[in-house]
């Protein structure tokens, strides 16, 4: 099924589409899409990146789902780039990112769209994120700053924008060159940095996403590639006058030599909720 956006009154989501790349994992796709709970029809574009067997659109009330099949597996960067272009061709204004296995909170899309309608300079809007295990158990909460100035200042020091929680202004994404494969495994940070050169990015300071941390699915090769891409981005956009750029550079050099599981243990310890007395 192919869908096309139409003019949208404030209470509708007809100019918003959920953008989800998927490679295998039909059960995760089904779980994620079933989590959407909005007062209006939700449009979804699944970019099937060469899955075997192919991803099938589940039948869910209040969701209109299209599957766009890539001829072969080409990686998340290519899948997202293709998805953004496809949504633009269909007339959508906003792309709401999510990954298979993650879960949306009720009314996430409506809240994000309302904010972006009221703030036209904002090209990307994230939300706070609860990180959970594969079984759904809570690990820690990501509560990045809300204001664009703080996000711009801290962009290389901490994760200020949780990619699967983001709503993106499609014309702005395409204006800065769309997703690209120049920085493998750091395609999100690459896009956000380019967006922040011309627009603002912000966060709604409330829970919007349950993010599944699948530690077994992160290979040492992919993690090293991600850290190296992040370091290249830091050097490309380095601001010597911003102390947080220096802190971020040191932090990512540390990441390069520290085992992934050790970093996750530290993060859980620092970000886990404390018992009240």
Regions found by a protein language model. Give the residues of each.
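Short, well-formed alpha-helical segments that are part of the catalytic scaffolds
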Residues: 24-38
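Hydrophobic targeting segments
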Residues: 14-20, 35-36, 42-47
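A conserved acidic beta->alpha catalytic loop
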Residues: 48-56, 72, 99-102
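Conserved donor NDP-sugar-binding/catalytic core segment of glycosyltransferases
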Residues: 107-139
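Hydrophobic/aromatic residue at the end of a short beta strand that borders the catalytic acidic motif
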Residues: 98, 103-108, 131, 168, ...
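Short aromatic/hydrophobic "clamp" motif used to bind/position activated sugar donors
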Residues: 95
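Conserved nucleotide-sugar donor-binding catalytic segment
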Residues: 21, 145-231
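Glycine-rich, basic loop-to-helix element that forms the pyrophosphate-binding segment
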Residues: 70-90
